[in-house]
Amino acid sequence: MKRRSSFQGLPLACIAISAIIVFGCFDKPSGSTKGAVPGPIKVFSAEKGGYIMSETVTKSNEEWKKILTPEQYHILREKGTEKAYSGIYASSHEKGTYRCAGCGLDLYRSADKFESGTGWPSFTKPIAPENIITRPDNSFFMRRTEVICRRCEGHLGHVFDDGPKPTGLRYCMNSAALQFVATGK
């Protein structure tokens, strides 16, 4: 009579665990916002100079593709990153507000923008903490903190802890994820 080893299923278990670890390290592109919880959210409006209630923006991938450029769609909906120094706002010094290119939510003020030397527009803080969401991003075997738009859940960029005073933070954004509105317009 053959003895069955208690380790017989071990190779299969190791393969399953390895697959979970490997594929768990790659965040899947969100694309559609159909999973977003619709409803009113409290956000800051630069135009109003205070907090307002706003509805979340929920669209299908097809709807997003109709209103965004291919580059904007890749960055906002598929968590892409534009090439360093290729974005129109990397070296911009004009005064105004940077909004989400997907839904128009106010995100950053030019007064909080600084030259980080990275090739992407960088800010020390958002216009209001309520206007963004941060979450862990472990894609490509890196540990980062992703920044997304609170209203449409579009990927904006990442935040790092190597920024200047007073916050010590560097909100490194993609130009294609932003829309600039000059002061007085």
Regions found by a protein language model. Give the residues of each.
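Short, contiguous pre-domain boundary segments
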Residues: 39-60
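C-terminal motif of bacterial Sec signal peptides marking the signal peptidase cleavage site
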Residues: 21-24
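Bacterial signal peptide processing site
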Residues: 26-28
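N-terminal export leaders
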Residues: 3-8
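A short Gly-Trp-Pro
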Residues: 56, 65-67, 79-99, 105-185
